[in-house]
């Protein structure tokens, strides 16, 4: 009957179900433990101050709680009973499920004990491992349960609320409360529960002895035996890797350690009397300072076992063994595991390289992959838990914490992931190999062994025969799960003591069957095998440690290329999920995505930072060749040659940072790396990391590291540009000179272009996108661009200082010069000479020039608007002057009217109307001259960069008349060519005067020109108006008036479309020349003649001549008809003579 019962109780099926359910229940317990420790997600009733008295009473009296006799204490509980039961029901019924699961587990263990099953991991592998896993699951589940701090409060509060609602306690509460009390000391209670079952545990652990002793060796033993090497026996390289205990070869040492320690501790009074088991137990204690309970919950081995043994009645003699093991582990364990990791790094690298080159070897040698992955995983999870727990348990002054730091761990992780990728990539190769192997070999040898087997019942014979037939006719659609379960059932049936067929007497059949089951897993369970041997989802529960690992990896150039292994590990996190705890899915998925995102982002930031440092070095080299740097060296050399002293020392100090090009390439020792060498090495390593994987898949999301890099480079590029603009000082008053800015920009672009050789990223597109955005007003993030910043500075600082008289525009030098009236914080020519403007154009591009031009012209239009307001005030007087320009008296009256000082003295710096008109005219001239200089720089750059485009444009432009040139004014401005009419000014004036009647506006425009013409003679009244031929400028910038007049006149009269620009300009010339001649006449009739007055009058003649010379609609012949040219010649002669003196 015992044999019949063994089949009827379905031991195999129950072991599968209960192990899975135990894993699910531990997931739920773990989730409850973490939730109760987090105030954000903790049930609010446990933190409610009104509930505090009831909870204290419950915990003190647990599990016997009388709610009715303590009605005052439980008054609030009764009031909130419905909410309490609803909120705590998940917690309570989870504990109830644990009670139910424990009962089922104990029932199965007792049943197997009563059937007197014979367990041997080398024969009935599935049955033995499932049994031991179930025992360990029971132990760890109870340990984890005992660590939930609020378990009594949760259960007691729920039961009290339930009792107050229904008048009786919840049905399972008495047994549940007793379980909580029993497992306050879980090891002690488990010793009582599992002690009677020690025979079966002894049988299982005894069979593990040989496997454990063979597997748990030092790295030196592994090296001697070439344990993971495919090339150790070249003649056997194409043969399938086979052993008699094939499934034990990749069995996790971490799992075996848990079997030995937990089972040996719980049943110490019997199991440890066996020398073999005691030796294994001691060895496990010597190799581990802590063991995994579940996820990041650990079991401090020596401390916990010592406390348990001391509390036992018999005062076990094993206490000294534990103390000796702890001393041994403290000295040797860390070093042994570190040596293993060193060996595994080289072994996995060799294995990975060989299999990548010859993926066909994955068929016969897949066992080596599982063995290597399993060993690597064991070492990684050992290191993780010890790095967290050892600092808390080690003695002060111990070096264990320092020895646990493994800077080369990322390399080990990288090769583990490489092997996983190879298995995934060549899934079909492995599957096809084992489909043929199973049908051509396994089915034959299994059939032969079945035929030779004696003592099989009909049902057992049918099961094995069907198994052999199925694998003989196997194909990719065969359901192999049923075959593996049949073999599991067979193990359970034939392991019972009274079974007629004893598997131990037919070892050959067991070996062939176990081998065949392993081969079947290679066909349809490769993903499960990967999870079993190399799942590192444990990293999910050590987020701070993981972050520390990948940050340290980035800081070490030799390991930097492996940093994305930590991003790829995030894909493992979802394997920690269980169907019995669905509420964890969102949280763990979010953690996986966050880690992957953080690793890639931080790696890209590090790469960008290194690029910045390399670019700084490149800029330093480029700056050495600039004239300013060369001048410093030359001056220093001259000063040092002339003598010694403070001056020579200061010169030497100034030149110390400068070195001749080529010096950076000198080497004294090839082992000595310079900082640029180190930066370049790190750059290449991180580039290799980011370029190794085009995409990373994590939790149904796809991450593209190169896309991250492109975005990071773009962001860093913008930050660097802004940092360079203000020379690293965000609150600086003056930006970097355009030439230096361009030099720095070219240095960074050179570095970026060099990066393209290290990683396949579209650097050109990144640079084009970024630089193109920097030519606009704002970038894609709505922040100011370099073009906007330069435009703002030139308008609000440079040109504003110029309009205040602090600068002079030199026509000869084509730049702004300091007038010397006030000390400036910058040299104007450092920002406005042709070389600087050409550099500026290259930085901001045509779009930036267009932006700056529009802003400049907007200011011009604003000045014209202000002048129009003055004209409107004196409209009648100007009408009279326009019609009586040949009447000297009336013209003089109008000029005097415009020259009257304002009566309102409250306004500071108030001037007369004439001076206001002239001042605004000069400002307009300055802006227009600067704008033309900017266009000249643009034209020069276009000619050098796009000669064919420029030639085509010139050919078109020179064959157009003025009307057509005006029509393509915007295009010509983009090429740096100034047309007959400034169309941007026309549009700006039209935009600022939308509601004025056209005829009225036309009249105002005519009167504005009249007003300027009448006021021009006042220029000669200032000593600062003297013209200096050496710089072709006046100190008050009055030489800018001709440009202003021509620009205003052409724009205003083109706006009205009456085709009278030439007539209006002749009218202006007549008014201006008559006014100047009248002034000459008044000067000649005056008795007092001053040289200063004469010099200032010469400026008027030059202004008149330059206005005509630069005007498209006037000629010298027209000037000659209304103004004697000999005055102009005399004026130039006098100015040159005065400047020479």
Swiss-Prot record:
Listed as disulfide-bonded, the cysteine pairs are none
Tissue spec? Expressed in neurons.
Among the Pfam families in the record, one is: Nckap1
List cellular component terms (GO): cell junction; SCAR complex
Keywords attached to this Swiss-Prot or TrEMBL record, sorted alphabetically, are: Cytoplasm, Developmental protein
Q: Which GO terms describe its biological process?
A: actin filament organization; cell migration; cell morphogenesis; cell projection assembly; collateral sprouting; cortical actin cytoskeleton organization; egg-laying behavior; embryonic body morphogenesis
Q: Where in the cell is it found?
A: Cytoplasm
Knockout phenotype, as recorded, reads: Embryonic lethality with cells differentiating, but failing to become organized. External hypodermal cells fail to spread over and enclose the embryo, but instead cluster on the dorsal side. RNAi-mediated knockdown results in reduced egg laying and in defective endocytosis by oocytes characterized by an accumulation of aggregated yolk protein in the pseudocoelomatic space. RNAi-mediated knockdown results in abherrent inx-3-positive gap junction formation along the adjoining membranes of EA and EP endodermal precursor cells at the 16-24 cell stage of embryogenesis.
Per the record, the domain of life is Eukaryota
Where is it predominantly found?
cytoplasm
* Assembly behavior: Interacts with aco-1, gei-13 and gex-2. Interacts with gex-3.
Role according to the record: Rac effector required for tissue morphogenesis, cell migrations and egg laying. May play a role in egg laying and in yolk protein clatherin-mediated endocytosis by oocytes during oogenesis. Plays a role in the formation of gap junctions between EA and EP endodermal precursor cells in embryos.
Per the record, the similarity remark reads: Belongs to the HEM-1/HEM-2 family.
Q: What is this protein called?
A: Membrane-associated protein gex-3
What is the species listed in this Swiss-Prot or TrEMBL entry? Answer: Caenorhabditis elegans
